[in-house]
Amino acid sequence: VHSHPGGLPWLSEADRRLQIKSALPWWLVCRGDIHKFRCVPHLTGRRFEHGVTDCYTLFRDAYHLAGIDMPDFEREDDWWRNGQNLYLDNMEATGFYRISLPSAQPGDILLCCFGASVANHAAIYCGNGELLHHLPEQLSKRERYSEKWQRRTHSAWRHRHWHASAFTGICNDLAAASACM
């Protein structure tokens, strides 16, 4: 447990490096509130394993670092080919509302159709034409929100408790991961 008196309720870049090194959950006291952070792997450089470390896990862990906890869903590989629509069926129930793509801000979720007609891939919009995501058979990464990804984008979503400063928790992890390389 440590505190950020008068600071932000997210782990700093140094906090994230030390948390990863300790492999322990961290508790942060800020403005009289206790914020609990599971020790999740850095958001970039993760190996893909469907249902364990996939695009939803990245989305869930990024939001955790931003102070919003998301449920974990049991999901079989290729669920989108079996008539399921897990993202669209769960976004509103977990606190998200649909926004127009031009109004997307850093931290908003982009649902994409990746080799499917159903929204089966989630990415976190980072602003400045970048997204953070995790594709099968690749390491999780930041990349340009290119025309290819714009064509695949099904919809954009924002959490009802999101505020712009929450993206700091995600950025601090990205910076901490870069410093570790």
Model regions and ranges:
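Short HxH-centered metal-ligating active-site micro-motif
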Residues: 1-13
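Divalent-metal-activated hydrolytic enzyme cores
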Residues: 19-41
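Short helix-to-loop capping/linker segments positioned immediately adjacent to catalytic or ligand/cofactor-binding
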Residues: 43-51, 98
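Active-site nucleophilic cysteine motif
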Residues: 49-66
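Surface-exposed patches in mature extracellular/periplasmic domains of secreted proteins
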Residues: 70-75
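...with weaker cross-activation on analogous glycine-rich loops/strands in unrelated enzymes
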Residues: 76-140, 145-146
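Glycine- and charge-enriched low-complexity intrinsically disordered segments
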Residues: 143-181
